[in-house]
Amino acid sequence: MAEFDARDLLDCYARGVFPMADAREDARVFLIDPERRGVIPLEAFHVPRRLARTVRGDPFEIRIDAAFHDVVLACAASGPGRTETWINRPIEQLYLELHELGFAHSVECWQGERLVGGLYGVSLQGAFFGESMFSRVRDASKVALVHLVARLIAGGFTLLDAQFMTEHLAQFGAREIPRREYHRRLDRALAAPADFYALGAAAPSADGAGRLALQLITQAS
């Protein structure tokens, strides 16, 4: 892995494969191209009713790329129901390099100056590859996901790759598709330009950001 750098990782994403590790302290990294892939259709993203009320109330200040490394570390930390993580130190470093190059981003939920939840992923043309999320208070990662989807819709993205299908993601409309179909969608997304900062860069969200996010999602459906 010593010669494998961020540019190599970008090439992997463009081919439809992504990195994983068995544990935080295991330095080995392997690449995955699942037979079935989890995706979240942006045009069919579902916001559960209770979550929509929460988002509309703007319980968190949403920041973009303000504390990327802290988000990755929080996602890599063990917690209730998660004793191990696939984010080892070589993978952590690769994502930091991608962030420096402008390809990896975080959506963060803040209460005052406390980071309480968020997610991060990789942006490449019209595709966004969601990597991991975390919450320190109720609904924080879910709110971050809603704001991510709104940002992707505004920026002209066509693919949100969730990697693996989970019951948690199913509530938002995620579904599983065969590898061949995934690669077709990926090829189309990579041929389309998109702008992750269409809703603005690293400035904190303004009042009404939740309503705007829900409006963008509704208009796309």
UniProtKB/Swiss-Prot annotation:
Q: Which GO terms describe its molecular function?
A: leucyl-tRNA--protein transferase activity
Q: Which GO cellular component terms, listed alphabetically, does the Swiss-Prot or TrEMBL entry include?
A: cytoplasm
Per UniProt, subcellular location reads as: Cytoplasm
- Record's superkingdom? Bacteria
* SUPFAM superfamilies from the UniProt entry: Acyl-CoA N-acyltransferases (Nat) (SSF55729)
Quote any Pfam family the record assigns: Leu_Phe_trans
For this protein, the record's Gene3D superfamilies field holds: Leucyl/phenylalanyl-tRNA-protein transferase, C-terminal domain (3.40.630.70)
Predominant subcellular localization, coarse grouping: cytoplasm
EC top class, in one word? transferase
What EC number(s) does the entry state? 2.3.2.6
Catalysed transformations (reactions): N-terminal L-lysyl-[protein] + L-leucyl-tRNA(Leu) = N-terminal L-leucyl-L-lysyl-[protein] + tRNA(Leu) + H(+); N-terminal L-arginyl-[protein] + L-leucyl-tRNA(Leu) = N-terminal L-leucyl-L-arginyl-[protein] + tRNA(Leu) + H(+); L-phenylalanyl-tRNA(Phe) + an N-terminal L-alpha-aminoacyl-[protein] = an N-terminal L-phenylalanyl-L-alpha-aminoacyl-[protein] + tRNA(Phe)
Q: Name one GO biological process term.
A: protein catabolic process
Record keywords, A-Z? Acyltransferase, Cytoplasm, Transferase
Sorted alphabetically, which InterPro entries does this protein's record hold? Answer: Acyl_CoA_acyltransferase (IPR016181), Leu/Phe-tRNA_Trfase (IPR004616), Leu/Phe-tRNA_Trfase_C (IPR042203)
Function (record text)? Functions in the N-end rule pathway of protein degradation where it conjugates Leu, Phe and, less efficiently, Met from aminoacyl-tRNAs to the N-termini of proteins containing an N-terminal arginine or lysine.
Family from the record: Belongs to the L/F-transferase family.
The record's section on PANTHER family has:
LEUCYL/PHENYLALANYL-TRNA--PROTEIN TRANSFERASE, LEUCYL_PHENYLALANYL-TRNA--PROTEIN TRANSFERASE
NCBIfam families assigned: aat
The name of this protein is: Leucyl/phenylalanyl-tRNA--protein transferase
Organism from which the protein derives: Phenylobacterium zucineum (strain HLK1)
